[in-house]
Amino acid sequence: MTRPVVLLPCDVKALGSYPFHCVGEKYINAVTHGAGALPLLLPAWGQGQDMEACLEPSSLAPLLESVDGLFLTGSVSNIHPDRYGSDMPASEPDLQRDDLVFRLVDCALDMGLPVFAVCRGLQEL
């Protein structure tokens, strides 16, 4: 029997002066040991003009069709206030995750893909 594959979008965090894409180990362990599934980490794909095409539904749908679920994890970063119409200053936003996850959620829900969310992930949902 094959194990289900669960997609986990990464945060973008600075380590020194370099950006890294990462997911908290507790979320990877929850998928692996708690759910008995295989975690697949998805980088936030960076920024720049060439990245926009990667975020289109025509690019995201084949990726989401290849997995059994989407897990929107918690994070120390916050969603940028522009996403929910606030003019409050952003504290530790992760704009790359925002760009990826909001489009992933729309596509996943349109496809009927199971989505599990905690903390920041629930706010994204």
Q: Can you name each region flagged by the protein language model?
A:
Residues M1-R120:
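N-terminal beta1-alpha1 cap of cysteine-dependent amidohydrolase-like domains
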